[in-house]
């Protein structure tokens, strides 16, 4: 027996009853970004594998274990993007968008791909909204990005459900000094580390700080801290960021173990976390990556950004019960037509009403059917009103207008008077 066709594991369909919440989130954020002066950029899903190997870093879990990579017909190694920053930096470089110190404030949205174990809030195809800023080196833009996300949580009604965690990773030189000290400390305790942390000792030892294994976290209690190795410039940058967040009353927690999962971060690192989604508690994360553009062959260019997971945010909206009820509003009007002349008139009237009443949700019966069956479909649609057109109505240029959600009587309304009458009824309903 042939296997029935199904979606690939971890790659989910977003069904019609789910998409209103997605559109609400995306629309709310797009409006907020527009108000802050950010411009949308649309990026390819496929990139050369080298882009991510160089940008994210060899030895990271993303590059070593999670990327969807294949050879095309020309033997080129291509990868389905696992994150958006590297592709955005590539586009900025390729098109000269940051040349001459030009400030760029960009945002994007779309699917990302990682071969992970699918679970609630974690998928192999997942969606992100990302923001990237180039050529602004100070803590003021770091603060703007964090405040921007804070405003989004307020608009969505979830501000009390998320907490900002903040850290500074210092300069690359400071991290190198700290890495050496951390490795020396852990080397003496190597056999006590979990297997994953042992592997990271040679690839990305700072990621051990983020281990979820309790025994490893216990070993880290006496470990040296990154803040003891910070350079003065990074300390001043971090203090400037905190001062700006304090000025607007934005509360945060300092988490010295917050290192982010990608190698390109420096100085500011932040995450918004929640305790409402179980293990998948990070809903937004980002930070500064001042060396990434030059790592890709460009001139030294300050960069900072963040990404948020759409699936997790929608799940949090659902968990908190803050999705506006009107997102799933039913149709305003259902048009029933009996006979070909009535069907033609229904089509004409429907288009006139759509022009006269912007935003109206209007359904015209399709597939003919008896009076009884059309009325049944009108009721099932959830529409508030029904229009009825038959031979007599067409001959007299009137419609039957019937409320479906209360006990109101059916009325006969002239075609010319219909837009005004319907608009008044919708305003009262």
Swiss-Prot record:
It catalyses: tRNA(His) + L-histidine + ATP = L-histidyl-tRNA(His) + AMP + diphosphate + H(+). One of its GO terms (molecular function) is ATP binding. Its main location: cytoplasm. It is found in: Cytoplasm. Signal peptide: none annotated. Keywords: Aminoacyl-tRNA synthetase, ATP-binding, Cytoplasm, Ligase, Nucleotide-binding, Protein biosynthesis. Its EC number is 6.1.1.21. It holds the Pfam family HGTP_anticodon. GO terms for biological process: histidyl-tRNA aminoacylation. One of its GO terms (cellular component) is cytoplasm. Belongs to the class-II aminoacyl-tRNA synthetase family. Homodimer. PANTHER family: HISTIDINE--TRNA LIGASE, MITOCHONDRIAL-RELATED, HISTIDYL-TRNA SYNTHETASE. This is Histidine--tRNA ligase. It comes from Pseudomonas aeruginosa (strain LESB58).
């Amino acid at each position: 027996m042939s296997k029935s066709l199904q979606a690939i594991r971890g790659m989910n369909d977003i069904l019609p009853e789910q998409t209103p919440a997605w559109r609400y989130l995306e629309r709310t954020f797009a409006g907020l970004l527009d108000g802050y002066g950010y411009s949308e950029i649309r990026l390819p899903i496929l990139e050369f594998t080298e882009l991510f190997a160089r940008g994210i870093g060899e030895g990271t879990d993303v590059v070593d274990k999670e990327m969807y990579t294949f050879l095309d017909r020309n033997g080129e190694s291509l990868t389905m993007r696992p994150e958006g920053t590297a592709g955005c930096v590539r586009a900025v470089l390729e098109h000269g968008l940051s040349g001459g110190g030009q400030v760029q404030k960009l945002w994007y949205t779309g699917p990302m791909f990682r071969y992970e174990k699918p679970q609630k809030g974690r998928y192999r195809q997942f969606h992100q909204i990302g923001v990237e800023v180039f050529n602004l080196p100070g803590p003021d833009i770091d603060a703007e990005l964090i405040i921007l996300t804070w405003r989004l949580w307020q608009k969505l009604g979830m501000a009390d459900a998320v907490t900002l965690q903040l850290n500074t990773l210092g300069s690359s030189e400071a991290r190198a000094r700290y890495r050496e000290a951390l490795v020396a400390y852990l080397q003496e305790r190597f056999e006590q580390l979990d297997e994953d942390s042992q592997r990271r000792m040679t690839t990305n030892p700072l990621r051990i700080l983020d281990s979820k294994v309790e025994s490893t976290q216990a070993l880290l209690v006496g470990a040296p801290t990154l803040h003891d190795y910070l350079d003065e410039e990074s300390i001043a940058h971090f203090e400037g960021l905190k001062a700006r967040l304090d000025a607007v009353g934005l509360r945060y927690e300092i988490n010295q173990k917050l290192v982010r999962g990608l190698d390109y971060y420096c100085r500011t690192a932040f995450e918004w976390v929640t305790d409402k989604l179980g293990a998948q508690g990070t809903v937004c994360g980002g930070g500064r990556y001042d060396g990434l553009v030059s790592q890709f062959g460009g001139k030294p260019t300050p960069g900072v950004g963040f990404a948020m997971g759409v699936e997790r945010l929608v799940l949090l909206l659902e968990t908190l019960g803050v999705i506006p009820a009107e997102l799933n509003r039913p149709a305003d009007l259902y048009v029933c037509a009996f006979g070909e002349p009535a069907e033609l008139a229904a089509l004409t009237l429907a288009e006139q009403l759509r022009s006269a009443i912007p935003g109206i949700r209007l359904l015209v019966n399709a597939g003919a059917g008896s009076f009884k069956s059309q009325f049944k479909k009108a009721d099932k649609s959830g529409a508030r009103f029904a229009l009825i057109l038959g031979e007599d109505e067409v001959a007299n240029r009137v419609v039957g207008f019937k409320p479906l959600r209360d006990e109101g009587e059916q009325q006969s309304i002239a075609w010319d008077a219909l837009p005004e009458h319907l608009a008044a009824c919708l305003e009262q309903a």
